Amino acid sequence: MKEWGFAQAHPNEELAEIHLFSMMKQQAGGDIEFTIKVKEYVTPKEPTMHFFAQADKETNQKTAPYRPSGWGKTMLEALSECVRAINRFPYEG
């Protein structure tokens, strides 16, 4: 456990370290910048899913709005899943 994890008094507090990433989604109407926030939980509700990534914008807004996200046991898994989700649908904002 990382040192900061000892600040959590109870698992229900869901203490997490936040990592920020940026990516450019390239599409016909121009490039769109997405910020991805990855939370690294001390004690996740699901033991194999320590990392949760979520984009700052929705995609597919005109049909069925979707906020790209991804879970994983590593930061790479969660971040990669979120990037794939961003690229799955067009940004229509």
Give the label of every model feature segment.
Residues T74, A78-I86:
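Stable alpha-helical structural segments in soluble proteins, enriched in small hydrophobic residues
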Residues M1-E33:
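Negatively charged, low-complexity tracts enriched in Asp/Glu with abundant Ser/Thr
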Residues T59-E77:
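A short, exposed loop/beta-hairpin motif centered on an aromatic-Gly-Thr core
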Residues M1-K2, N87-G93:
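Short intrinsically disordered terminal tails
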Residues F21, K37-Y41:
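A structural detector for beta-sheet-dominated domains
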Residues A28-I32, V42-P65:
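Acidic, low-complexity, intrinsically disordered interaction modules
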Residues A9, I18, A55-K57, S80:
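Short stretches within intrinsically disordered, low-complexity N-terminal or propeptide regions
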Residues E17, T59-Q61, R84:
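Local alpha-helix boundary/kink/capping signal
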